[in-house]
C-alpha cells in the first residue's frame, strides 16, 4: 500500500486504480478508515474520535495534494509525499 504521509503513528495511504469516489485509507494500530477527499466523509471507520479528528484536520489542510495523488494513482504515476500534521 503506497504510504503518502505519516504523523503521530497514523499512516495515510492510497491504492493504485482504486474505485471512485476519490478517497484515502488510514491505519492507526489496529484501527482503519476510508475517508472521502472531496467531502471528508467517512466511508468506513473504526478510528477513535481523537485520531479521526487529527486525520480530518490534516486532510482539510491538504485536500489539493490528496486530489493530485488520487489522479496520479488512477494513472499509475508515482505518488507524492504529503506534509504530515505537526
In which residue ranges do the predicted regions lie?
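Basic nucleic-acid-binding interfaces
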Residues: 1-86
Amino acid at each position: 500500500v503506497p504510504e503518502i504521509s505519516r504523523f503521530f503513528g497514523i499512516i495515510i495511504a492510497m491504492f493504485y486504480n482504486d474505485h471512485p469516489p476519490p478517497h484515502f485509507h488510514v491505519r492507526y494500530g489496529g484501527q482503519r478508515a476510508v475517508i472521502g477527499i472531496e467531502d471528508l466523509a467517512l466511508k468506513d471507520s473504526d478510528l477513535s474520535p481523537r485520531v479521526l479528528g487529527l486525520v480530518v484536520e490534516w486532510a482539510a489542510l491538504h485536500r489539493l495534494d490528496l486530489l493530485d495523488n488520487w489522479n496520479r494513482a488512477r494513472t499509475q504515476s508515482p505518488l507524492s509525499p504529503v506534509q504530515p500534521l505537526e
